Amino acid sequence: MDLSSLRPAKGAVKARKRVGRGPGSGNGTTAGKGNKGQQSRSGYQRPVIEGGQMPIYRRLPKFGFTPPNQKAVACVNVAQIQMWIEKGLVGEEISVLDLKHLCNASNQEYFKVLGNGELTSTVTITAHFFSKSAEEKIAKAGGKIVKAYRTLEEAAKVNGLPFEEALLTPKAKVVKVKKEKKSVKS
């Protein structure tokens, strides 16, 4: 017995259905698609065809829009942070990486700390945004706030800076340079 002689058990692997290979196979001619019509053709078919009726997507009015520069923001309450401290999940310093793991968030998300609940522990929290009530509660408990400017994904792409430092450096503002008009020579 060797590797080349090993085979799956009989009946364990079902044979692939080969359609359109002649009428004798039982799946020839129309290849299981029936006769004529849009579903029998190749390529794209609209998922919902309502016949002559006005389709639902045209009956309903257009509504709102999605802003192109929208930021994905994960929110964390002060009460959640206190609970994590009591459970021993975080220490006195809470970084953006800690928030990412505890909130099960992605690398593209910004983090905002909200002031719902009470905070009794002294902590240093690094996040992108803080509500006024959260700032007050953290300061009242003797903690500190550190503002991050980049997402984890953006910080990883910054060359020449350590990861933690890249998180805390503000992004350079984009300055549009006006081109001078060329003078027409006469």
From Swiss-Prot:
Pfam families: Ribosomal_L27A (PF00828)
Keywords per UniProt: Ribonucleoprotein, Ribosomal protein, RNA-binding, rRNA-binding
InterPro entries: Ribosomal_uL15, Ribosomal_uL15/eL18, Ribosomal_uL15/eL18_sf, Ribosomal_uL15_bac-type, Ribosomal_uL15_CS
Bias (Gly residues): 21-35
Chain spans, region Disordered: 1-48
GO MF annotation list: rRNA binding; structural constituent of ribosome
One Gene Ontology cellular component annotation held by this UniProt entry: cytosolic large ribosomal subunit
Family per record: Belongs to the universal ribosomal protein uL15 family.
Function field: Binds to the 23S rRNA.
PANTHER family linked to this entry: 50S RIBOSOMAL PROTEIN L15, LARGE RIBOSOMAL SUBUNIT PROTEIN UL15M
Oligomer status and interactors: Part of the 50S ribosomal subunit.
Protein name: Large ribosomal subunit protein uL15
Organism: Chlorobaculum tepidum (strain ATCC 49652 / DSM 12025 / NBRC 103806 / TLS)
Gene this protein is translated from: rplO
